[in-house]
Regions:
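Juxtamembrane/transmembrane-helix interface segments of polytopic membrane transporters
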Residues: 18, 22-26, 147, 151, ...
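Hydrophobic alpha-helical transmembrane segments of membrane transport/permease proteins
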Residues: 14-65, 154-195
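Hydrophobic alpha-helical segments embedded in or immediately adjacent to the lipid bilayer
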Residues: 114-118, 127-180
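Alpha-helical transmembrane segments of integral membrane proteins
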Residues: 1-3, 94-127, 143, 175-337
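Residue-level signal for discrete positions within transmembrane alpha-helices
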Residues: 11, 93, 97, 133-140, ...
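An internal, D/E-rich "acidic patch" concept
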Residues: 57-113
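Transmembrane helix irregularities
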Residues: 29, 138-141, 273
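Hydrophobic alpha-helical segments of integral membrane proteins
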Residues: 8, 50, 60-76, 86, ...
Length: 337
């Protein structure tokens, strides 16, 4: 428990830095939220009245002080684009982004880890070259380009995929009863199989588009860690003892791969949450990424600051989860930390 508290306390300076930088950078962005809120037909006097109502006429340090006081009370402000509290908006949209990122990560893991292990056992062979080629290709193409390409091929040309217009075709299906906010999980809990199939069909293309970019770091780290493990003394001893190859790989070598792979998975998942911004725009996904884009376009300071702060907190929690997992896999981490 002391290990966890030490890690949490160590994140406080980082979160303070995020709050300060996000506030001042968002206020330095071009655009006037008062003018956006007033509309194109508003005159200068109306815009000034709205600016005063929103508190934007105050000096920047005074605005920052009020922002920090509101944060201390759990208030992230009110979004100009939706009219709702930012915290409410983020809570409503976060499950959609987590669902998409989780499926993308599962897709990447299911391909990258077996491929990395297989490539390491056949160094410089056909599988190894194929692995390195796939890693290079998956890292070379932007996620939004892959998403657009998939939409063109699988929806427009072949007609295999549903319309890329969100999480569910709500003309045909109603969302499942809200439990977690993730449609696939909620449909599974409710036992609503038609909605589950419909939600999965909407999820496949964006998850694969996002997951392809995650293949590269996971496969690369898995291959490198497995090569290092296979070249270690204890593996050579196990081979000399006549142990089955499968047991050597899965029981001894793969255990040593878990620590570096788990570390990179935390970073990859946080990256996927950030990359949702582009994929959600392509597929009409109603997540926090699309919300952030709308907020930036409208110079919606409160929404932008809330999004960045939420991402920072999620990143901290992901790293804490990775540290705890590393401690369970290798107790030496507890003492080294």
């Amino acid at each position: 428990m002391a290990f966890v508290w030490k890690r949490l306390l160590g994140t406080i300076p980082s979160l303070i830095g995020v709050v300060v930088l996000t506030f001042f950078i968002s206020h330095a962005l071009p655009g006037d939220p008062a003018a956006f809120f007033a509309g194109p037909a508003a005159n200068a006097a109306s815009i000034e009245n709205i600016r005063a109502t929103l508190g934007l006429d105050r000096p920047l340090p005074v605005q920052f002080l009020h922002y920090v006081i509101d944060l201390a009370h759990g208030n992230l402000g009110r979004s100009l684009t939706t009219g709702q509290p930012v915290l409410t908006d983020l809570i409503e949209r976060l499950p959609a982004s987590l669902e998409l990122s989780s499926f993308a990560l599962l897709f990447a893991i299911s391909i990258a880890i077996p491929m990395g292990v297989w490539a390491a056992t056949r160094i410089n062979g056909g599988v190894d070259h194929a692995c390195r080629g796939l890693v290079t290709v998956s890292a070379a193409f932007p996620t939004f380009f892959v998403g657009l390409l998939f939409v063109y091929i699988f929806y427009f040309l072949l007609g295999w995929a549903p319309q890329p217009l969100g999480r569910l075709n709500e003309i045909t299906f109603s969302p499942p009863p809200h439990v977690t906010g993730a449609y696939t999980v909620d449909a599974l809990i409710a036992g609503d199989w038609p909605v589950l199939r419909a939600a999965l069909s909407q999820l496949i293309l964006p998850a694969i588009s996002l997951g392809l970019f995650a293949l590269a770091p996971i496969a690369r780290i898995t291959r490198a860690a497995m090569l290092e493990a296979l070249g270690s003394d204890f593996i050579r001893t196990a081979r000399a003892s006549g142990l089955p190859v499968r047991k050597i790989l899965m029981t001894y070598a793969f255990r040593n791969v878990l620590l570096p792979v788990s570390s990179v998975l935390g970073m990859v998942f946080s990256f996927l949450l950030g990359s949702n911004v582009l994929i959600e725009q392509v597929f009409g996904w109603q997540g926090v990424g699309a919300y952030a884009v709308s907020a930036v376009i409208a110079s919606d300071y409160a929404a932008v600051q809330g999004f960045v702060l939420m991402m920072a907190v999620l990143y901290v929690l992901l790293n804490l989860a990775v540290d705890i997992f590393a401690m369970l896999v290798d107790p030496r981490v507890r003492y080294e930390g």
